[in-house]
Amino acid sequence: MTTLAIDIGGTKLAAALIDKNLRISQRRELPTPGSKTPGALREALTALVEPLRTEAHQVAIASTGIIQEGMLLALNPHNLGGLLHFPLVQTLETITGLPTLAVNDAQAAAWAEYHALPDDIRDMVFITVSTGVGGGVVCDGKLLTGKGGLAGHLGHTLADPHGPVCGCGRVGCVEAIASGRGMAAAARDDLAGCDAKTLFIRAGEGHQQARQLVRQSAQVVARLVADVKVTTDCQCVVIGGSVGLAEGYLEQVRAFLMQEPAPYHVALSAARYRHDAGLLGAALLAQGDTL
């Protein structure tokens, strides 16, 4: 059975066909529309999947935000251009005429990455550091989603009570500081207006402010890793996302984690499936891997 998998992120939309052996083909990408209207997202999704829908038997969506009874509810609306509510499952079923499943993108990625780990790993946490910061928790071999779909939204745990206001309305969230959007918002002087990708380039060139912004992000994520270790007693933490997978970033997170007391230490690794983890995890769930 072929699955049309869709990944809805803060900066891009991706889609691909995935077969029962998790082989990916015909991968496509489009920018996430900046408009706040549901119509703009609907049009973008239609353009994204139209060339693929006739070859699929079902649709699986991994999306930023909270997925609740098929609705996309944004905890931080800034990550989707201000969109608050969107009938995600209904929209894709209308566009494709196919049965559709939707799950949070970090939860989906956690499920994919869990399947790539050795069989003796039953407890793991996935953290994505990208436009926002998200997470997924697997406990005793089961993916935790929560009754309201909120489980694993680790980016909205507290990093600094005196920090910047997060898009969710809370002050000092991990996401407000460590995410690509948070790093860009903190950039000043000659870096003002730069995106996270540019900040990493400038940091690599030795720019002191850029290096400090990257260090601050890595330190906040390391503290988050320590928190999830002591909360879940996970056997490992997998880091993904465009920031999380940037050159040298994981090494900085690991170095900061080693400064914490020993009980907070945990094995860290980069996402095996990298930017395809959300697509693959959603496909796994649609193909019968139960939550």
Curated annotation (Swiss-Prot):
Gene Ontology terms describing biological process: N-acetylneuraminate catabolic process
Any one Gene Ontology molecular-function term assigned to this protein's record: ATP binding
Catalytic reaction annotation: an N-acyl-D-mannosamine + ATP = an N-acyl-D-mannosamine 6-phosphate + ADP + H(+)
EC class of the enzyme, as a word: transferase
Chain sites annotated for binding Zn(2+): 156, 166, 168, 173
EC number(s) per entry: 2.7.1.60
Pathway the protein takes part in: Amino-sugar metabolism; N-acetylneuraminate degradation; D-fructose 6-phosphate from N-acetylneuraminate: step 2/5
Gene3D superfamilies, per database record: 3.30.420.40
Sequence positions that bind ATP: 5-12, 132-139
Keywords, in A-Z order: ATP-binding, Carbohydrate metabolism, Kinase, Metal-binding, Nucleotide-binding, Transferase, Zinc
Entries under HAMAP family matching the protein: ManNAc_kinase (MF_01234)
Family: Belongs to the ROK (NagC/XylR) family. NanK subfamily.
Function noted in UniProt: Catalyzes the phosphorylation of N-acetylmannosamine (ManNAc) to ManNAc-6-P.
UniProt subunit comment: Homodimer.
The name this protein goes by in its record: N-acetylmannosamine kinase
Lineage: Bacteria, Pseudomonadati, Pseudomonadota, Gammaproteobacteria, Enterobacterales
